[in-house]
Amino acid sequence: MRVGCDIIAISRIEKIHSRHGKNFLDKFLNPKEQILIKNPATLAGLWAAKEAASKALGVGICELCSFFDIEISKDEKNAPKLKYSQKITKDFNITQTSLSISHDNGFAIAIVAVV
């Protein structure tokens, strides 16, 4: 099992989004993921989730794993769900993933476990 974690100030993501708008969103979220955004906290949570997912691979966001190799969605209970691209799943021999996102006191945090 491998674990990745990321924490970010919601205000930091909010400032970047207000400055760059949809261009910022398009750099790390696909259209289905953009629909999940309800407020700055959920946007920051999505950022943290993708960063944590890349760190769980031991590589971070880079040429080996782009933001678009990681997809965040919701399950039937509205809990966050993580899916890697087929290439990442094969290259890193991933059989299971688990994602948790939380927001509190101006921060968003995400933890990813990969088996």
Swiss-Prot record:
It is an enzyme of class 2 (transferase). Mg(2+) binds at D6, E51. It is found in: Cytoplasm. GO terms for biological process: fatty acid biosynthetic process. Its main location: cytoplasm. Its EC number is 2.7.8.7. It catalyses: apo-[ACP] + CoA = holo-[ACP] + adenosine 3',5'-bisphosphate + H(+). The keyword Transferase applies. One of its GO terms (cellular component) is cytoplasm. The keyword Acetylation does not apply. Its cofactor is Mg(2+). One of its GO terms (molecular function) is holo-[acyl-carrier-protein] synthase activity. InterPro entries: 4-PPantetheinyl_Trfase_dom, 4-PPantetheinyl_Trfase_dom_sf, ACPS, Ppantetheine-prot_Trfase_dom. NCBIfam families: acpS, pantethn_trn. Belongs to the P-Pant transferase superfamily. AcpS family. HAMAP family: AcpS (MF_00101). Transfers the 4'-phosphopantetheine moiety from coenzyme A to a Ser of acyl-carrier-protein. This is Holo-[acyl-carrier-protein] synthase.
